[in-house]
């Protein structure tokens, strides 16, 4: 009999504790945001829409090395390499299918020229799936992105047609590695 009364008291206490918890949550600040009216907080390293950037001279940074397409685990990046008269590579077309992209950031890490970068933009909703396939013109932005002073062709020491290595601006003379051997 005492066990039965003890179970009733224990059950009533559990119910009262649950009611207090529910009512206390009713007076707290709400976690739900009214999205279009209230801006959403994004962490500093949020990975959103992918963009292609330009170097400080205004030319596109992408050298069509295809490393981003190889690093992509879902294969949503495709591009075709072309070459200018001075020997510089560029993508003839660059295409990203955002309906397949998982925004993992591996393409950004693989890019040697920092041409492909992820931005905090996440508003990419479309009614048709075909509109989620972005071409180079849709991805290319006018600015340098996260690395404003980086220029791959100056840093890498790439030979420019008509000029020997080491003769470009801000470029050191090449080192003869064989002379360093013992």
Swiss-Prot record:
Q: Which Gene3D superfamilies does this UniProt record tie to the protein?
A: 3.30.70.3270
Q: How is the cofactor bound?
A: Binds 2 [4Fe-4S] clusters per subunit.
- Enumerate the cofactors the protein uses: [4Fe-4S] cluster
Q: GO terms for CC?
A: plasma membrane
Which Pfam families does its entry note?
Fer4_7
GO BP of this protein = aerobic respiration
Can you tell me where the transmembrane regions are? none
Supply the alphabetized keyword list: 4Fe-4S, Cell inner membrane, Cell membrane, Iron, Iron-sulfur, Membrane, Metal-binding, NAD, Quinone, Repeat, Translocase, Ubiquinone
How it assembles, according to the record, is:
NDH-1 is composed of 13 different subunits. Subunits NuoA, H, J, K, L, M, N constitute the membrane sector of the complex.
Task of the protein: NDH-1 shuttles electrons from NADH, via FMN and iron-sulfur (Fe-S) centers, to quinones in the respiratory chain. The immediate electron acceptor for the enzyme in this species is believed to be ubiquinone. Couples the redox reaction to proton translocation (for every two electrons transferred, four hydrogen ions are translocated across the cytoplasmic membrane), and thus conserves the redox energy in a proton gradient.
Q: Which family does it belong to?
A: Belongs to the complex I 23 kDa subunit family.
This one is known as: NADH-quinone oxidoreductase subunit I
Q: Which organism is it from?
A: Pseudomonas entomophila (strain L48)
Its taxonomic placement starts with: Bacteria, Pseudomonadati, Pseudomonadota, Gammaproteobacteria, Pseudomonadales
Which gene is this protein's source? nuoI
């Amino acid at each position: 009999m005492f066990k039965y009364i003890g179970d009733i008291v224990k059950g009533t206490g559990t119910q009262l504790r649950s009611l207090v918890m529910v009512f206390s949550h009713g007076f707290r600040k709400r976690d739900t945001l009214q999205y279009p009216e209230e801006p959403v907080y994004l962490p500093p390293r949020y990975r959103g829409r992918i963009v292609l950037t330009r170097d400080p001279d205004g030319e596109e940074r992408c050298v069509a090395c295809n490393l981003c397409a190889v690093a992509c685990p879902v294969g949503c990046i495709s591009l075709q390499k072309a070459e200018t008269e001075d020997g510089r590579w560029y993508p003839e077309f660059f295409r990203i299918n955002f309906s397949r992209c998982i925004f993992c950031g591996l393409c950004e890490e693989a890019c040697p020229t920092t041409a492909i970068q992820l931005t905090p933009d996440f508003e990419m909703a479309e009614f048709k799936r075909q509109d989620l396939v972005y071409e180079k013109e849709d991805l290319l932005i006018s600015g340098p992105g996260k690395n404003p002073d980086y220029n791959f062709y100056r840093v890498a020491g790439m030979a420019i047609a008509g000029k020997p290595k080491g003769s470009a601006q801000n470029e050191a003379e090449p080192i003869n590695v064989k002379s360093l051997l013992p």
